[in-house]
Amino acid sequence: MSSRALRRLQDDNALLESLLSNSNANKMTSGKSTAGNIQKRENIFSMMNNVRDSDNSTDEGQMSEQDEEAAAAGERDTQSNGQPKRITLASKSSRRKKNKKAKRKQKNHTAEAAKDKGSDDDDDDEEFDKIIQQFKKTDILKYGKTKNDDTNEEGFFTASEPEEASSQPWKSFLSLESDPGFTKFPISCLRHSCKFFQNDFKKLDPHTEFKLLFDDISPESLEDIDSMTSTPVSPQQLKQIQRLKRLIRNWGGKDHRLAPNGPGMHPQHLKFTKIRDDWIPTQRGELSMKLLSSDDLLDWQLWERPLDWKDVIQNDVSQWQKFISFYKFEPLNSDLSKKSMMDFYLSVIVHPDHEALINLISSKFPYHVPGLLQVALIFIRQGDRSNTNGLLQRALFVFDRALKANIIFDSLNCQLPYIYFFNRQFYLAIFRYIQSLAQRGVIGTASEWTKVLWSLSPLEDPLGCRYFLDHYFLLNNDYQYIIELSNSPLMNCYKQWNTLGFSLAVVLSFLRINEMSSARNALLKAFKHHPLQLSELFKEKLLGDHALTKDLSIDGHSAENLELKAYMARFPLLWNRNEEVTFLHDEMSSILQDYHRGNVTIDSNDGQDHNNINNLQSPFFIAGIPINLLRFAILSEESSVMAAIPSFIWSDNEVYEFDVLPPMPTSKESIEVVENIKTFINEKDLAVLQAERMQDEDLLNQIRQISLQQYIHENEESNENEG
């Protein structure tokens, strides 16, 4: 080979070696970079997994730690051996599978635990009830047993704390028999008692309570209830009513709470009633609400206090008007009202005719309140309570349509004197509606309506709310309201206000929250106020020792006996737990023993003779019996209670079902002030209408007699022919 060929071969070998060395260097560099990338990727995934698995269980966390330790050990082995090992990273799918397995294990463990606890569900419910009871107890003890400092600032007697109740003698209470004008009650105290009355119209709707009782009830179901007819009507009548709705604007609306009021069709938003589809649309209401003037209030107070000086009464009226607004309901169209009232009077009093009365409210006067209430009572006695509720709601609608826009029932914003006839109809409609609500099971709504009824005249209390309000609040488990009210002057100013039922309701409320000492003190206070009734209750309901009740006979005390009968009619519904009845029996035995030892004193004037009560000319008593107790007893329609009413009450007084024991004039001047049904009847027109009805009846009797004679004659002829 030539030298040139040798040099070329050497250059080629050198080039080959250089290329080989470069390739090896690149391999080493790429291997290092790959290992670094793998290490970096592993760190990123571990960070992501730490964030994602932070909410997982501790078992999963331990598993991930073990994986990391195994990976670290593998890296150490690789470095020690010098031989690369393949690193396998956990993928997302594998981790999800691990999580699903862990969750399945956890669910299975939870299901097994639930099965084990299935037998202890009743115990858990009892513990939950105990927690609720403890919460109520702490809440009541925090707010319910505080004194009303505002009333004490007025220098007015208020009920003491339960611990001091035993030191308060009954004679510290005043009597309404000698104070018919409530002059000893500072009217400014009502400002601090507004919490005991109603200021939320939503609570007056039964649907509010239905939503609380059945949380899964749908708005569509409630809408269907609102769209239902309140009384049975034919499809033809419904079509006619729908045509009338198109002619009268603002009738019903989407929420069934709009009603036109006046010739301008101005819409009135209803507060506590809803328009039903079978109610006949009208352009304006039947009643209006009038604010009473100072002269009206003076006439009213002169009726209540016929023996007081007029100047003193005027001063009291001016003080009242600073805090309270007084109203009266009156007919918008007096002529139309007199016509409807005459038809009603003839169909109810002169010539009782149920069919004529039903026809009166069905076609001629569909919004005549006395007729609606009377027909509702007829349906109740016939057992048709479904139609009763619709008629009562229609009667309340008449008053709801007439209410002022800013009215609330807090005892200050709206009071209705009982001497006015249509005011009394509003009282009666609410009372009947409360009974209907209680029968339907909405006790909470019934208790709210009781607040409304009481707020219309909290001092006079014409229908005796103090005799039955405890019943609804106990059934509604509202113990805080009862305990707070027991410290209010509304229950403690006059002895007639601290009723037997409410006194025992305070005892029962303390028992329900396990305040035994307070319950004992409340029972001792009740015995000092009502010794005769509690002694009789001890014998009849608790089957106590008769020897302990000697010298405490209720015989001859009509008022105390009537109040006791009214309470005993509902005693089993309230005292329905054996431990509570046992407590009442044992504590009454102890109190009666202390009474006979002389350690307990009662008022020496208890059950005094009221023969001279008429000399005081009190409009709130009849022979010593509170007139509101009599009204409540009659309206309750409990046979055992009505049997305890003295017979002279029925014979010597006006007891109409639509107007029970209406107020009677106390002087010549008050004859024109006190309204009754005859106030809205024209005597001449009534005489003419009565004569026409008598002629019609005579004619019908003659027709019946002729028909009967003809029938007899035909039967005689047929018998002769057969013979």
From Swiss-Prot:
Covalent S-S links between cysteines: none
Composition-biased stretches (Polar residues): 27-37
Cellular localization per UniProt: Cytoplasm
Modified residues (Phosphoserine): S119, S160
Positions of post-translational Phosphothreonine modification: T158
Alphabetically ordered keywords of this record: Cytoplasm, Phosphoprotein
Location of region: Disordered: 21-125
A GO MF term: molecular adaptor activity
GO BP annotation list: rescue of stalled ribosome; ribosome-associated ubiquitin-dependent protein catabolic process
Main location: cytoplasm
InterPro entries per the UniProt record, alphabetical: TCF25/Rqc1
Gene Ontology CC entries for this record: cytoplasm; RQC complex
Biased composition regions of type Basic and acidic residues, renumbered to the chain: 109-118
Family: Belongs to the TCF25 family.
Biological role: Component of the ribosome quality control complex (RQC), a ribosome-associated complex that mediates ubiquitination and extraction of incompletely synthesized nascent chains for proteasomal degradation. Within the RQC complex, RQC1 is essential for the recruitment of CDC48 to incompletely synthesized nascent polypeptides that are ubiquitinated by RKR1/LTN1.
Record note on quaternary structure: Component of the ribosome quality control complex (RQC), composed of the E3 ubiquitin ligase RKR1/LTN1, RQC1 and RQC2, as well as CDC48 and its ubiquitin-binding cofactors. RQC forms a stable complex with 60S ribosomal subunits.
Extra facts: Present with 339 molecules/cell in log phase SD medium.
Record-given protein name: Ribosome quality control complex subunit 1
Organism the protein comes from: Saccharomyces cerevisiae (strain ATCC 204508 / S288c) (Baker's yeast)
Organism taxonomic ancestry: Eukaryota, Fungi, Dikarya, Ascomycota, Saccharomycotina
